[in-house]
């Protein structure tokens, strides 16, 4: 029994050290997975890596680390405090990833919901822990992408936890996300003045357009390449958004807002909603 446990520990350690081609990120993933398992034990159903690290187009200078934990039941107040403390310790020890780790903790019973559940779930992002974060249109989009590209760090394949997702529903969710999440940003001058947000907006608009028009949810890299070829008038703006890194400036506020209006026109033409 002790020998089998030792083999399992060695195999898991080797696997975590080989999840991505970035040793520093593998160390972060190991610390998170070990910490969550230590705190929650058998309450953990699965731990998953998603986002650009799973798609294969991660850019260290600007990309985030996207994680999801699936739990048996909701977390208690003590567990919530422990999870928050874990994330704060991780970002203090790895300051290069401060404000660049996003992680949700979803009870297993909510995973069967195709539409955003009314019940909120804990979420860590931008250096802040939200014990009750509501799910939005990103719910079905993220689950679809996890079903196609997600990497299980612990537990079963992600597809075993969710019902099949229809691509039409993903296209509709992406269109709704455009109008509910992004269109209001046109009037938010302070938000648009932020270089990071300008880049983030432009690249997300490329993904929305690619998903809605092509019916193919994809990475920002793939969507950006498609958008530059399909809408060459926006090539320069998209390339600048792709090249942006933390610490650099992107002074394209007016152009980003114009691209947002352009995206609205293209999505409206589909009559998807």
Where are these regions (language model features)?
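Conserved NTP/Mg2+-binding pocket subregion across the NTase superfamily
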Residues: 7, 17-18, 85-195, 202, ...
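Helical scaffold of the NTase/Pol beta-like nucleotidyltransferase catalytic core
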Residues: 7-48, 78-80, 273
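Glycine- and acidic
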Residues: 14-19, 69, 242-248
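Extended, basic/helix-rich recognition subdomains
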Residues: 180-240
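Structured mid-to-C-terminal alpha-helical surface segments
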Residues: 216-273
């Amino acid at each position: 029994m002790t020998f089998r446990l030792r083999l399992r520990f060695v195999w898991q350690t080797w696997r975590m050290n080989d999840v991505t081609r970035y040793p520093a990120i593998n160390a972060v993933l190991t610390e998170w997975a070990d910490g969550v398992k230590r705190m929650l034990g058998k309450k953990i159903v699965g731990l998953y890596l998603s986002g650009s690290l799973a798609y294969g187009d991660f850019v260290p200078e600007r990309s985030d680390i996207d994680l999801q934990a699936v739990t048996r039941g909701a977390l208690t107040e003590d567990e919530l405090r422990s999870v928050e403390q874990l994330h704060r310790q991780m970002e203090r020890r790895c300051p290069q990833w401060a404000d660049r780790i996003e992680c949700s903790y979803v009870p297993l019973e909510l995973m069967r919901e195709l539409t955003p559940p009314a019940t909120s779930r804990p979420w860590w992002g931008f250096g802040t822990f939200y014990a009750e974060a509501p799910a939005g249109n990103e719910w079905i989009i993220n689950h679809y992408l996890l079903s196609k590209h997600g990497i299980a760090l612990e537990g079963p394949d992600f597809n075993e936890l969710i019902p099949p997702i229809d691509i039409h529903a993903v296209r509709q969710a992406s269109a709704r996300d455009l109008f509910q999440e992004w269109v209001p940003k046109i009037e938010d001058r302070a938000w648009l003045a932020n270089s990071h947000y300008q880049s983030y907006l432009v690249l997300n608009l490329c993904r929305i357009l690619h998903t809605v028009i092509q019916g193919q949810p994809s990475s920002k890299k793939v969507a950006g390449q498609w958008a530059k070829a399909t809408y060459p008038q926006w090539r320069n703006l998209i390339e600048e958004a792709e090249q942006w890194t933390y610490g650099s400036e992107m002074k394209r506020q007016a152009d980003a807002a114009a691209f947002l209006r352009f995206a609205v026109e293209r999505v409206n033409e589909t009559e998807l909603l």
